[in-house]
């Protein structure tokens, strides 16, 4: 039994038993991770002059640009380090996204030419020495276009231990700059409360308290909330409203509560690239329910610049029941999705809930083609 310190929040627990025990079970040299971490910690002490303090430098880079209106922290990573970038996404979003402010981390986008990025972007690259050629041309193009870019080169992947220290301290210091508490997550509980209410209704009635509109063309269900108003509840009209009312400094968040596989992620990655290319807006992809404890705090507590698209599917007859709870895993997942839809709507965050049939992959492909058409027509109308 490993007893973890109770006063360390999940996103700051990477170098506690939470991260080290799994690393040891995988056969990794966790002592090497800690050696790198200790070296970084020594250089980030309060008595180290600012210009020699790696965490202070990173904090200043993020905060200074934030106050210049560049709040989209775009994190690009060597393919071997991409899972680590997801941890940074949670660290930044959950620590700084509250009280109607926050730095918005953008992770996992397909790299593009400078013309597809808005002026609200700054860039960080996480790379491995010996593999610098992967993004050399992109770096040159971004710098030539005037985008702030800061690369961090790791000697090997064990140096992630040092980077955990750098980022944890830098983000905590950013909280001071932004005037928020980087160690709480006051809005996460709101979605949990809504989910619980949805499940209670389901257990009492056997039905979810939701009735979707049906799009005649695509034959998929949809709901909308968060201040979105259209004369007739048609999916085309709602999506157009999404597009027209999204400011250039806004962002789109695609939030699928769908069975994960590479094909699904690839389609959503294409959707992100499409929206970025047509609207020059930043995009986020968060699979549910994971994102609820990652970027979910930012979505409900951060700046009101996001547009949110939640995706669910119809449950199958033979879904696995959770023993002793009276509902299935699908029921729980749907309640989490609909609960977050309600939470976003009540916080006046424009949100669209798309509900697919059991053939959700084909429905998703149809939805992509629909978005391709609607964004093209919107561009022509403008």
Residue spans for each PLM region:
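Conserved, well-ordered active-site substructure
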Residues: 289-325
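Ligand-binding clefts of soluble mixed alpha/beta catalytic domains
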Residues: 176-185, 313-323, 327-330, 337, ...
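A generic structural motif
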Residues: 3-8, 95-110, 148-160, 278-290, ...
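C-terminal amphipathic alpha-helical interaction region
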Residues: 184, 189, 204-210, 217, ...
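Phosphate/diphosphate-binding loops
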Residues: 129-146, 150-153
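Active-site phosphate/pyrophosphate-binding segments
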Residues: 1-124, 129-133, 169-281
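Low-complexity, glycine/alanine/valine/leucine- and proline-rich hydrophobic stretches
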Residues: 142, 152-154, 326-340
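Amphipathic alpha-helical packing elements
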Residues: 271-301
């Amino acid at each position: 039994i490993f007893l973890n310190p109770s006063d360390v929040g999940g996103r700051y627990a990477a170098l506690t038993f939470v991260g080290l025990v799994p690393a040891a079970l995988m056969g990794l040299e966790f002592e090497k991770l800690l050696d790198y971490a200790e070296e970084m910690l020594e250089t980030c002490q309060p008595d180290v002059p600012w210009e020699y303090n790696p965490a202070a430098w990173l904090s200043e880079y993020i905060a200074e640009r934030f106050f210049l209106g560049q709040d989209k922290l775009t994190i690009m990573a060597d393919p071997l380090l991409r899972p680590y970038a997801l941890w940074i996404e949670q660290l930044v979003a959950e620590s700084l996204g509250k009280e109607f402010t926050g730095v918005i981390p953008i992770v996992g986008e397909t790299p593009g030419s400078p013309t597809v990025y808005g002026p609200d972007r700054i860039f960080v690259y996480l790379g491995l020495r010996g593999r610098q050629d992967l993004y050399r041309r992109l770096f040159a193009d971004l710098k030539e276009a005037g985008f702030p870019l800061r690369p961090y080169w790791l000697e090997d992947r064990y140096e992630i231990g040092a980077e955990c220290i750098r980022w944890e301290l830098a983000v905590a210091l950013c909280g001071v700059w932004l005037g928020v508490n980087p160690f709480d997550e006051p809005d996460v509980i709101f979605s949990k409360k809504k989910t619980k209410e949805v499940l209670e209704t389901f257990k009492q009635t056997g039905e979810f308290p939701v009735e979707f509109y049906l799009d005649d063309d695509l034959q998929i269900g949809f709901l909308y909330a968060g201040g979105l108003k259209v004369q007739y509840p048609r999916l085309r009209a709602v999506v157009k409203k999404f597009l027209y009312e999204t400011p250039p400094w806004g962002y789109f968040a695609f939030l699928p509560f769908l069975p994960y596989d590479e094909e699904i992620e690839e389609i959503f990655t294409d959707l992100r690239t499409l929206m970025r290319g047509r609207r020059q807006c930043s995009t986020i992809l968060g699979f549910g329910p994971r994102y609820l404890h990652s970027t979910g705090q930012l979505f409900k507590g951060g700046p009101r610049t996001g547009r949110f698209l939640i995706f669910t599917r119809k449950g199958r007859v033979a879904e696995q029941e959770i023993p002793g709870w009276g509902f299935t895993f699908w029921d729980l997942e749907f309640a989490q999705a609909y609960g977050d839809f309600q939470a976003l709507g009540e916080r006046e965050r424009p949100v669209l809930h798309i509900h697919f049939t059991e053939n959700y992959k084909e429905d998703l492909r149809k939805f992509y083609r629909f978005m391709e058409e609607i964004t093209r027509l919107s561009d022509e109308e403008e």
